[in-house]
């Protein structure tokens, strides 16, 4: 069995979008810890291939890859937790949908990082 890919719909909770963007921009700035967080999450078996904001107030759609052996429940717990895209703040509602790659003859949305 291979990695599982998910599309995650992130909806901002009422009045929380601005706080999230401020936190995200700070994290992605030089010295903000973004690269370290990506490395730690990858080590845990979670990798975000892309984040795609529709508007500044949401939603944001992300493509995540999850290492083999990690359940959907464990992924949801990660996404909702302190290491997930909400930065440990109560700002996002995260709807995680696994992508059935068998429907597209095994094609994945991105080249897998876990083999």
Language model features by range: what are they?
Residues 1-59, 65-77, 95-115:
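Short S/T/G/P-rich N-terminal loop/turn motif that feeds into the first structured element of a domain
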Residues 80-90:
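A common structural junction motif
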